Amino acid sequence: MGHLARASAVALALKPVANPIIVSMAGGIAEIPSFMGIRCEYIPGRDRLWMSRERWDAYLRDRLLALVEETDARVISFDGVVPYPGVIAARNANPKIKLVWVRRGLWQKKPQRFILGLQAKMMDAIVEPGDIARSYDFGPTSKRKDSVLTSPVSLFRQEDALSREDARKALGLDLNRPVALVQLGTGDSDVNHKMTAALEGLLGWKDLQVILTKAPVDKNGNSLAPEGLDIKVARYFPLAKVLHAFDAGICATGYNGVHELLPAQVPTVFVSNIRGTDDQEARARWCNDFGYALRADQADLADITKTVKQLQDPEVRARLSAKCAELPATTGGQEIADILYALATVPAAASAKTFTFSRLMAQDHINRGIRHVANLGLRRVALVYRFIFPHKDAQETKQAPPIFGDSIVPAELHALIKSSTRFEHLITGASSVYRAKREGIAMSAYGDLVEFFKK
């Protein structure tokens, strides 16, 4: 959800002067249209395995080009670590489009760093959202001179945030009892153990209410929460609006968590997720070293419990909250919006970057080939294993024609996105010409006829 939160902050800043549209492969996009009044389109990601990698690249390109033509968009802004080949191909197919890479800093030294130069050359501009921990950034983007640095981006805005009382009413909480927010993931066993260790650190906090954004259960439905906690699972979007409800927070050290909880002055323990490109440990160390938050050792379950327990001390909470008042303003959303608007109002140089694009695609194919060889043996071992021990309840994608829909009701959109039926989402107010073009794109991608569904 990190890119969605940043994109939402930028889109909200653009609304007075432009018509921003958010496109994403994340299911969380279902929350945005009705709650923020921003038009959105969901695109099924490559991980759905509904088509080959090469076909998906072309599908993404065609979806973006069709949306640009429908809306007369001037700029495509990509927020992520690796710009998809389909995104770059869309820019190359229509040189009148300007492509901006919103490239977050604090990268770990992962293989993606080797093609940073080629990727940068395909962009019309690169913007780095500021990070309060930037002085601890020693990753591959930290020394590059190809980006414009802005202030940090956050959906939390003091002027929009609900008061403590109103926020608690919105979440259905007792107004007088303490509340702790826990935003840690579940899934693999090590991640689950961290969730349990963090919750154990809250035991003994008198009258505490614990709010989680997802149920604390493993993949088999077994509870990860210790006995004795009053736990409630609550979904509220955007969560930044109700942060004043909380007396304490336990969160992964992702960009959004840090730049929402700390500006809201929520006393927080950070438990880093070391997977992926984001250097969460560097961010957590900075927050701890300068007194803005507490860092738990993500590799030590006992330390997680011990560190979280410190939040039960009102003096610790008061100290952390007061320190967070010193943080700089998180005005990066408006700054990025200004950059995008300026680019949109200046005529584009109509030249495709064909040579650089070809080099980048060649490198991408080489990387895929290396991964393919490395994974081939593992895949065959896995196939033999799965033949001997088949899945008991394998879910298959329904091979029916794709369904087109333009619902913006979160529950309906969530259900369509998560279903096994191939779902094609349309922006609100789509023209008949756009519908027809999208039908052709779907036929090329899936090879079936399509059905239309409207709510």
Residue ranges and their predicted role:
Residues 165-248:
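Donor-nucleotide binding loops and adjacent catalytic segments primarily
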Residues 312-401:
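C-terminal amphipathic helix plus adjacent low-complexity
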Residues 257-305:
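Catalytic binding pocket for nucleotide-activated donors in carbohydrate/polymer assembly enzymes
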Residues 104, 109-111, 119-186:
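A nucleotide-sugar donor-handling region in carbohydrate enzymes
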Residues 13-66, 297:
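Conserved nucleotide-sugar phosphate-binding/catalytic loop shared by glycosyltransferases and other
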Residues 65-83:
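Short N-terminal targeting/anchoring amphipathic segment
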Residues 1-6, 189-191:
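A short, glycine/small-residue-rich beta-strand->loop->alpha-helix junction that serves as a flexible
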Residues 243-257, 266:
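Acidic donor-binding loop of glycosyltransferase active sites
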